[in-house]
Curated annotation (Swiss-Prot):
One of its GO terms (molecular function) is ribosome binding. InterPro entries: eIF6. Belongs to the eIF-6 family. This is Translation initiation factor 6. One of its GO terms (biological process) is cytosolic ribosome assembly. It comes from Saccharolobus islandicus (strain L.S.2.15 / Lassen #1). Keywords: Initiation factor, Protein biosynthesis. It holds the Pfam family eIF-6.
Length: 223
């Protein structure tokens, strides 16, 4: 499996800065060339340098899959136009919601999405249409409503909060149609997304992620 430890801007919380699917990886401007080369090599995608809401916290603000990308309503017009032009094979939409941390509130692969319980019916419909998923439901993971922050799911597997119950795991596996395991990142963090960036081709983990955590991640993501 293509897997590599990584730090960005002096932190191991790489998932707050990076968004990826199987076609594109969106990263902050200002990364050094070696870091960008490593990201491309591991994830096997085209690299797009961008901002959202004049911020580099792309992994927090963006959610999506190979079909579509959702941006928060705080996205500035020129940022939206730039991503719309460069994410050519994906539908790109702004979700007009008071919720802006879409990466933390939507967990998705190409088949399904689990979303923040407080999204309304209109927001749920837009999310489903933009992502082109067959299934969508509102819910929690290990009593956490910020479902995108405590899990990462690809089309090959998934890793979620270590306190997720067996019943929840089975429900998640049925929803996403992949095997899903529990684990941690960055030496014990339950906020999986903050330390794990993955697609079907490769995985980046925060630099403080331990050997046992990496073994669990590799198994969970289907490698």
């Amino acid at each position: 499996m293509n897997l590599q430890r990584l730090s960005i801007f002096g932190t191991d919380n790489i998932g707050v800065y990076i968004y990826t699917n199987n076609k594109y990886t969106v990263v902050p401007r200002g990364l050094d060339s070696e870091t960008k080369e490593n990201i491309v090599q591991i994830l096997g995608t085209e690299l797009i340098e961008a901002e959202i809401s004049r911020s580099f916290l792309l992994g927090i603000f963006i959610s999506g899959n190979d079909n579509g990308i959702l941006l928060p309503k705080s996205t500035i017009d020129d940022e939206f136009r730039f991503l719309k032009e460069n994410l050519r094979d994906c539908r790109v939409e702004v979700l007009n919601s008071k919720v802006t941390a879409l990466g933390n509130t939507i967990l998705t692969n190409n088949k399904a999405a689990l979303i923040y319980p407080e999204f309304n019916d209109i927001e749920e419909k837009i999310i489903k249409e933009t992502l082109g998923v067959e299934e969508i439901r509102r819910g929690k993971i290990a009593q956490m409503i910020t479902v995108g922050s405590v899990g990462v799911v690809t089309n090959k597997g998934g890793l979620v909060h270590v306190d997720t119950s067996e019943k929840e795991l089975k429900e998640l596996e049925k929803l996403f149609s992949v095997k899903i395991d529990i684990g941690t990142v960055n030496f014990g963090s339950v906020f999986i997304r903050s330390g794990l960036v993955a697609n079907d081709k490769g995985t980046l983990v925060g630099a403080s992620t331990t050997g046992p955590e990496i073994l669990r991640i590799q198994k969970a993501l289907g490698e």
